[in-house]
Amino acid sequence: MTKIQVLEIFSMVLSAGKSQKYSISFDYDTEFNELNVFLYCCEDSGSIDVVDYAISSQLSLDELFDKLREWTSIIAKDRKLQERKKK
């Protein structure tokens, strides 16, 4: 499995989730020949913030999986916080 396939699957999982609050985007930097990946958070107010980013060409596949696990943890913590606020 290639890095781009892993990122595309992660993106599909995010878009299929209950909340469309988080998304990722890819940006290929032709000057440096690097694939940049950004994790975005879309707030209720309409603002879109960059939560984190990675330069996937500088990461091994294992390191990329670690980064995606880290992002999943960020999203899960935020969802738990939002659920507590609703109660």
Residue ranges and their predicted role:
Residues 1-32, 43-87:
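Negatively charged, low-complexity tracts enriched in Asp/Glu with abundant Ser/Thr
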Residues 35-41:
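Short linear proline/tyrosine/threonine-rich motifs used for host-factor recruitment
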